[in-house]
Amino acid sequence: MAAAVLLSSCVKDTLYDTPHPDYGKIAVTADWSARGEGIDIPATWTVTMGDYTGTETSATHTPDHLFAPGSYTLAVWNPAEGITVNGTTATIAASTGTRAGTDAFVNNAPGWFFTYTEQVTIEKDKDYPLTAAMKQQVRELTLVVEPTGDAAGRITEIVAHLTGAARTLDFATDTYGAASNVVLPFTKITEGDDAGKWKATVRLLGVTGTEQLLTGEIRYADGNPTPTTLKSDITEALKGFNTGKGESLTLGGTLVETPEGMEVDGAEINGWEEVKGDDVNADL
């Protein structure tokens, strides 16, 4: 009897550090501090890890889900207009309007999109407070051109598009997919120091492929002169576009008409240079 009492007094309960001794648990806090100026923090964001997916509206996501020990890819992103996400691949929607149904053209104004990925190793009986430093993946591009030549004042419309825009991005590997096109919605500046210049603003997931070409047509009042073919290679000016997406990029160039006899045969935009701040009147 005494031996049994002595034996039972030696038995102790196993102590654990968490209420989930066989699993791990995560809490993810999103850090939006790297977003561009004037961009709001997204209203909702999504967390995926293993077979778990959750949506959050607060600063920190603390799911009840328990994770078995192992290695996982944590992916965090926000729903954005015109962008779908499958796994860690984001895809820009096809263009609508006059380009609807044309796979070669993608949406030129998707919503602001942010992502984060991390490899997480889970051990049992542990809690993991994680911080997701959200990376801005959509960048704004503005092109400003100053027409020259006798027909500059007769321009009524610039119809153009940009090649070499990325339609997809695997944000876990920072890999851009095949090149697509985006419409450049040029409008004439009618007020201020830059009146008479033309400007187009788009949002891009990134640039890809070997070149980025601006191609299109310049149209004139009363069809005089006849429409001018427009072409410009801006590959060099966009070579660093996929880095520093938190800052918008403005490029300025001079629209040079090339006459042939009494007709305007073609036009090129030369001297693309970055324009800092709001100053687009920088010797374009």
What feature does the model see in each segment?
Residues 82-129, 223-256:
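Structured interaction patches on ligand/partner-binding surfaces of diverse proteins
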Residues 28-42, 144-153:
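Structural motif
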Residues 184-190, 268-284:
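Short, low-complexity, Pro/Ser/Thr/Gly-rich segments in the mature regions of secreted, periplasmic
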Residues 20-21, 130-138:
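Conserved "repeat-terminator" motif of extracellular CCP/Sushi domains
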Residues 40-92, 154-238:
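Tryptophan-paired
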Residues 6-9:
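C-terminal motif of bacterial Sec signal peptides marking the signal peptidase cleavage site
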Residues 22-28, 72, 139-141:
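Short structural boundary motif marking the start of a folded domain
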Residues 11-17:
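Bacterial lipoprotein signal-peptidase II cleavage site
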